[in-house]
């Protein structure tokens, strides 16, 4: 069984990793992925900076390194540590769906963060996107 686990720095993500191992056991193939969001040019303009290729490249490199570190940290929660890690830049829901399809994952697992209605309006739910678009079943761990 191929299990794709989407993580961030939250406690809920750590719970999703642990629950995945409890449910699917040591024989499953695990991939732990963290997706770092990309910024648009408006973000830099809003804080008074004009984007340059050099600034953009540095920012993206830092974002990618942080995403890799988050995925590696979550991978340490899997007993035995036999886990693939993946770090991507982009929209979390879209990228997790793409990874699930590329890897022919049997299930995508994520942790659920309780958000208020206002928080969901400002930051749409990755879980909702996955449930609607993933090419395989989605397990949302609470």
Labelled PLM ranges:
Residues 1-54:
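Small/aliphatic-rich secondary-structure junction motif
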Residues 107-132:
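Glycine-rich, Arg-bearing micro-motifs that act as flexible, cationic patches
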Residues 25, 79, 135:
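Short conserved AdoMet
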Residues 34, 111-113, 142:
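Short secondary-structure boundary segments
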Residues 132-142:
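Short, flexible loop segments at boundaries between secondary-structure elements
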Residues 75-108:
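Structural beta-alpha unit
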Residues 52-69:
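A short acidic, glycine-rich active-site loop
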Residues 31-33, 84-88, 139:
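General small-molecule cofactor/ligand-binding pocket signal
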């Amino acid at each position: 069984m191929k299990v794709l686990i989407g993580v961030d720095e939250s406690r809920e993500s750590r719970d999703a990793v642990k629950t995945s191992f409890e449910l699917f056991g040591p024989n499953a193939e695990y991939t732990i992925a963290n997706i770092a969001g990309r910024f648009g040019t408006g973000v830099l303009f809003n804080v008074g900076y004009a984007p340059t290729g050099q600034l953009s490249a540095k920012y993206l490199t830092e974002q990618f390194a942080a995403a890799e570190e988050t995925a590696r940290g979550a991978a340490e929660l899997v007993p035995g540590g036999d886990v693939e890690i993946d770090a991507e830049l982009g929209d979390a829901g879209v990228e997790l769906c793409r990874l699930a399809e590329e890897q022919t994952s049997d299930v995508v697992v994520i942790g659920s963060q309780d958000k208020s209605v206002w928080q969901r309006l400002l930051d749409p739910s990755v879980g909702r996107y996955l449930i609607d678009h993933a090419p395989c079943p989605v397990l949302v761990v609470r």
